[in-house]
Swiss-Prot record:
Phosphoenolpyruvate binds at residues 22-23. Belongs to the EPSP synthase family. MurA subfamily. Disulfide bonds: none annotated. GO terms for molecular function: UDP-N-acetylglucosamine 1-carboxyvinyltransferase activity. One of its GO terms (cellular component) is cytoplasm. The keyword Repeat does not apply. This is UDP-N-acetylglucosamine 1-carboxyvinyltransferase. The active site is at 115 (proton donor). Pfam families: EPSP_synthase.
Length: 420
């Protein structure tokens, strides 16, 4: 199993080019199942989860080629089951179900895996598909969906805000008969990006990015070319990297308007931030960040996927800051690892109180999930001595070539292969 060896402390400074958004690329790849003509996707990140999705699409009979762009040809799908061996590492595979049942009248997906951060039930996905007329059964670890004829448009009020279920319902409703309205929909930029992609193919979706999405069902989708939006979480991670190391970074191929809550907290922490149409710069002018208090919330609130990085910021900041996690349970697994490096923190239920320390010390730590692993790597960059980050397969699921990008900012980081 690969590890990172990081030598610190380092002041991280320079430019970094942001990759396409994993959380948009995944639903868009699955939504391409709906297309009856070939699709070309650009700015698709090179990640483990993307590779797994491509394998899964190929298993279904979709022809997928990666040659700079990703080309998806779903004209000859002949298999309607996403099997356990491909699904077990990635919860996003549930997004195959809506497009399969919408276009072909049937589909089945093994109950998904992914990060070990609390309960992520598929109930909301199932309820939404049932409201569109699908018959759902759970059998031997598989979610199976069927419908005779086309799905039927419906007025769906979601019990709670869910990014995943919003995407499932939206992609299924595109080919449904009549109009679907999703109330209490998630508002994340990646949902808007998925809707924009589908509209490029001929869908009629309006309101994506708000809490009320309207889908006028169409009979078929064609092909087209679409560029995935930049990854706001990767952008935020590199901004925090500069903030905790008292450095300066310019993020290119970024989308500042997807990061309002994060940029506000970084400014509160003392960062000097400037933005352009497709770039963000952060400069700490050599100063230590100030601790901030924040609460995660659905978009446009503070993103849960930036919580671990801001935990690190607070743990090396001037003062004390409180972080409350409202989206997922069990998402402070990075805190005990950071305490091994000399951090001072107390966890009480879904809140962590962070007391800033002057310095961290290198240690052997273990990544537990995708974003937690990023915070441990950044901690290694600023800690005195050597840090070994174990189980970095988590980080490869969500960050493209992170060690090369950090090296470009001056980090002393290397990947140790399991046979090294």
């Amino acid at each position: 199993m690969d590890k990172f060896r990081v030598q610190g402390p380092t002041c991280l400074s320079g430019e970094v080019t942001i990759s396409g958004a994993k959380n948009a690329a995944l639903p868009i790849l699955f939504a391409a199942i709906l297309a009856e003509e070939p699709v070309e996707l650009t700015n698709v990140p090179k990640l483990k989860d993307i590779d797994t999705t491509i394998k899964l699409l190929n298993r279904l009979g979709t022809k997928v080629e990666r040659n700079g762009s990703v080309f998806v040809d779903a004209r000859h799908i002949n298999e309607f089951c996403a099997p356990y061996e491909l699904v077990k590492t990635m919860r996003a595979s549930i997004w195959a179900l809506g497009p399969l049942v919408a276009r072909f009248g049937r589909g089945q997906v093994s109950l998904p895996g992914g990060c070990a951060i609390g309960a992520r039930p598929v109930d909301l996905h199932i309820t939404g598909l049932e409201q569109l007329g699908a018959e759902i059964t759970l059998d031997e670890g598989y979610v199976k969906a069927r419908v005779d004829g086309r799905l039927k448009g419906a007025h769906i009020v979601m019990d709670k805000v869910s990014v995943g279920a919003t995407i499932t319902i939206m992609t299924a409703a595109v080919l449904a008969e009549g109009k679907t309205i999703i109330e209490n929909a998630a508002r994340e930029p990646e949902i808007e990006d998925t809707a924009n992609f589908l509209n490029t193919l001929g869908a009629k979706i309006s309101g994506a990015g708000t809490d009320s999405i309207t889908i006028e069902g169409v009979e078929r989708l064609g092909g087209g070319t679409y560029q995935i939006l930049p990854d706001r979480i990767e952008t935020g991670t590199f901004l925090v990297a500069a903030a905790v190391s008292r450095g300066r970074v310019v993020c290119r191929n970024a989308k500042p308007d997807t990061l309002d809550a994060v940029l506000a907290k970084l400014r509160e922490a003392g960062a000097d931030i400037e933005t352009g149409e497709d770039w963000i710069s952060l400069d700490m002018h050599g100063k230590r960040p100030k601790a901030v208090t924040l609460r995660t919330a659905p978009h446009p609130g503070f993103p849960t996927d930036m919580q671990a990085q801001f935990s690190l910021l607070n743990l090396v900041a001037d003062g004390a800051g409180m972080i409350t996690e409202t989206i997922f349970e069990n998402r402070f697994m990075h805190i005990p690892e950071l305490i091994r490096m000399g951090a001072h923190a107390e966890i009480e239920s879904n809140t962590v109180l962070c007391h800033g320390v002057d310095k961290l010390s290198g240690a052997q730590v273990m990544a537990t999930d995708l974003r937690a692993s990023a915070s441990l790597v950044l901690a290694g960059c600023i800690a005195e001595g050597t840090t070994i980050v174990d189980r970095i397969y988590h980080i490869d699921r969500g960050y493209e070539n992170i060690e090369a990008k950090l090296q470009g900012l001056g980090a002393k980081i290397e990947r140790l292969h399991s046979n090294d």
